Amino acid sequence: MYSEWLKGTWMLDSFTAADEEGETIDYMGAGATGFICYSNDGWMSVQIIKPDRMRYDISDVEGGTEEQTISAARGMFAYAGKYTVDEENAIVYHHLEFSLIPNWIGSTQKRYITKESDNVLILSADPVRMGPGGNKRKSRLRWKKADIT
């Protein structure tokens, strides 16, 4: 059921994180953009960027100052690897082989699937420390199926 439905490209609609008191933040900032892809051969990739990432002074690959390079890394969230789906419990497991966060390489990230509609996917995770104050927050990413036209 979910395995087939997930396949394809989904565009980020929102990325929020709520703490135990219910305070919600836009984790990557209002207007964050990105996509997640689930391929037919069992691979997935996600890329998310903040809307206000600092641009490099020049357009070379290594053209940024140290401050610009740090800002670019902090303004992006990305990983890829194989995925498996637990149909019964509506969970997708991301088995990471690549990640902007080095400590996540080799890990498995569990995401709870909610099918809001045929074209809207919600992925949420167990609470982790993220955002201001280092509070534990539960992330909720809302994705819309990419337009193929």
Regions found by a protein language model. Give the residues of each.
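Lipid interaction determinants
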Residues: 1-149
